[in-house]
């Protein structure tokens, strides 16, 4: 994956340091509508593995991942194995119509939940787009962080390691995920400014 821009990487370093939910703890329940108005309650997926992907179509990192079909390929691989994939857009300026257009243009087969107030994003401590969270069948958060190590300057592999893929494979084998938390990279989540800012 090519380096997009130094400004984009700088945005990652300026991400707010919300604590959010802790790995190993219960994933907080929430209800959000998707781009078509269908409401999704996290607890309705209890008994299944859930992937939450914070996204923003205007972010160059997100755009590159969708050009490369990173997320869509993972969804296609695991959807028949009782894995639920939910994108979440916490950008304050996002409109459902924008999401529908983005989904149609990119062939996105899973819903994008609309969180313009940033309530759920802040609850989970989502800092970047993308920022990935994996929840096991018992409702426990087992991973949060980057989709892969493409921007890790210390990696020595020929290609990037996909952390979400590693976590899902381990969960489906009934094993403990080999990685629990990594530093996310991408654009900062464009939260609605607070009244005091």
For each of these PLM feature ranges, what is it?
Residues 1-4:
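Positively charged n-region of N-terminal signal peptides that target proteins for export
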Residues 6-16:
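Bacterial N-terminal signal peptides
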Residues 17-21:
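Boundary at the C-terminal end of the N-terminal hydrophobic targeting segment
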Residues 30-50:
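A short beta-strand-turn-helix
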Residues 43-64, 85, 168:
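Short active-site neighborhood of thiol/selenol oxidoreductases, capturing the structured segment around
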Residues 63-106, 114-123:
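Structural microenvironment flanking redox-active thiols in thiol-disulfide oxidoreductases
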Residues 102-144:
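Short, internal strand/loop/helix patches
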Residues 136-137, 141-197:
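Thiol-/selenol-based redox modules, centered on thioredoxin-like
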